[in-house]
Amino acid sequence: MDAQLEWASSLVPKRQLQQQQQQQEQQQQQQQDFHKDQLMTVGMRIRQRVDQGYASRTPSTSDASLQPGVIRDYSSVIVPQFTRSPLPTANSLPPMLINQRTMSTEASSLEKWDVAEPAAEHETMVNGSKRRL
């Protein structure tokens, strides 16, 4: 009977230890979930701050700069009366690049390099004379 009491009394601390471990694991899981949620919403929070015009209060900002929704447009100051020029239409061909020695009819092609004779594959020209390989 003493062995049974001793065994029963040893179970109580083990159960308490298991419960404490489970509680700690649950707390760690909740913290991990919280951090994952924070990371998943970073992009949304950044866009929200940009939309608000950086109206968050930081120690280095003054009260005058904390007007919500104010985004200053400096485009007219940087480039006064800026207008976008239209792009050329793609209906016409681009101009030919012509040099003194090149013409559009003399474009490089593989026909110049084709070998007329099958036996010529094994011959090469060295100093004007044919040599077999």
Curated annotation (Swiss-Prot):
<comment type="similarity">
    <text>Belongs to the DIF1/spd1 family.</text>
</comment>
<keyword id="KW-0963">Cytoplasm</keyword>
<feature type="region of interest" description="Disordered">
    <location>
        <begin position="109"/>
        <end position="133"/>
    </location>
</feature>
<feature type="compositionally biased region" description="Basic and acidic residues">
    <location>
        <begin position="109"/>
        <end position="124"/>
    </location>
</feature>
<keyword id="KW-0597">Phosphoprotein</keyword>
<dbReference type="GO" id="GO:0008104">
    <property type="term" value="P:protein localization"/>
</dbReference>
<dbReference type="GO" id="GO:1990846">
    <property type="term" value="F:ribonucleoside-diphosphate reductase inhibitor activity"/>
</dbReference>
<protein>
    <recommendedName>
        <fullName>Damage-regulated import facilitator 1</fullName>
    </recommendedName>
</protein>
<dbReference type="GO" id="GO:0005634">
    <property type="term" value="C:nucleus"/>
</dbReference>
<dbReference type="GO" id="GO:0005737">
    <property type="term" value="C:cytoplasm"/>
</dbReference>
<feature type="compositionally biased region" description="Low complexity">
    <location>
        <begin position="16"/>
        <end position="32"/>
    </location>
</feature>
<feature type="region of interest" description="Disordered">
    <location>
        <begin position="1"/>
        <end position="40"/>
    </location>
</feature>
<keyword id="KW-0539">Nucleus</keyword>
<comment type="subunit">
    <text>Interacts with RNR2 and RNR4.</text>
</comment>
<dbReference type="InterPro" id="IPR013900">
    <property type="entry name" value="RNR_inhibitor"/>
</dbReference>
<dbReference type="GO" id="GO:0006606">
    <property type="term" value="P:protein import into nucleus"/>
</dbReference>
<comment type="function">
    <text>Mediates the nuclear localization of RNR2 and RNR4, 2 subunits of the ribonucleotide reductase.</text>
</comment>
